[in-house]
Amino acid sequence: MINDGIRGGYSAAALAYAVANNPLMKTHPYNPAEKKVWLMMFDIVNQYGCCMLGHLPVSNFSFLEDPTVMTEEFISSIPADGDDGYLLEVSLEYPESLHDAHNCFPLAPEHYQTQLEDLSEEQRQTYTKIYGKETYKGSSKLVTTLHDKEKYVVHYRALQLYLQLGLRLKAVHRVIKFHQAPFLRRYIQHLTNLRAQSKNPFEKAIWKLMINSIYGEFYCPFFFSIKPTHRSR
């Protein structure tokens, strides 16, 4: 169940389009009769470090005997800094009323077996040009869709966000409860401060690596690091 919740990194190119109406721009005429529109690009750094500042799973992992006690009201009330955390396997409904608003960046990424009807017209033409009439077999991709989610494994804090943004909880199938604590906070804060005080590219890189490598070790499934050995007598 835990491995089902590990999906990797998601990237996408959205089709959202905006036109700036900025009085400070010299390359595009400003129209004072229209509303001011500013386009901004954000480069958000240290996201791995930010994740590890919070409460993380530590011990006492166990399945709840009755997962139905995890109602939407109860899930929404779980504190981010509480002693207990939860990993849930749920079914979610993606209301059609949210589709237009969420179209460029849907919630709850998942591994999905793509179908021919999922492709754009241009992609279908490209496929036909290359493979002719060969049946499209599809492949598993990490994607965001507006489909309902069945037996979707998710951390309770991510689920709280999904519910807050309008997804509906249909069912709770399994729940793992665990003790959580901010056991990495002081160390991550120390490395972050050292990175901020860096005076050259090498120092910035080494402190960044020491933060990100910890995240990577937590991300790797434990069984990947187990190497069976055989000793003959």
Language-model features, listed with the residues they occupy:
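Conserved acidic
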Residues: 1-233
